[in-house]
Amino acid sequence: MSVGDALTKKDVTVIHVIATVELRPGKRDTFLTEFHRNIPNVRAEAGCIEYGPTVDLRTGIAVQLPVRDNVVTVVEKWESLDALRAHMAAPHMVEYRGRVKDLVVKVELQILEPA
């Protein structure tokens, strides 16, 4: 997965990313251990404002989407699109993706800008 030429708007000042990571059954704890090992590297990157994993919370609120026990949602905020691109290509991210690839079914990104 890479952030490539499809993202061409360079003048966006804050980038929000919601990464939905679907995991193989029973692999969430192992994935989160690897994820937490990489957090200090990511938060030290230039342009990182926020970066952290979240999991679905059972609330009983009627309009909530169904709870997914095999999903980790990563909430990110970056100072710029260039910072996000650099993050995606960082050596520690390449290494991290290699460590978790057998735990992951798929990753979907929402890349957002303030409205």
What are the language-model segments listed below?
Residues 8, 24, 86-89:
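Alpha-helix initiation/capping motif
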Residues 37-49, 68-110:
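An amphipathic, aromatic/His-enriched active-site/gating alpha helix that lines ligand/cofactor pockets
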Residues 2-13, 52-70, 95-115:
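Glycine-rich beta-strand-turn "strand-cap" elements at beta-sheet edges
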Residues 28, 61-62, 85:
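A generic structural signal for short coil/turn motifs at secondary-structure boundaries
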Residues 15-21:
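Active-site-flanking beta-strand signature of metal-NTP-handling nucleotidyl enzymes
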Residues 22-26, 78-79:
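Structural beta->alpha junctions
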Residues 26-32:
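Short, conserved charged micro-motifs
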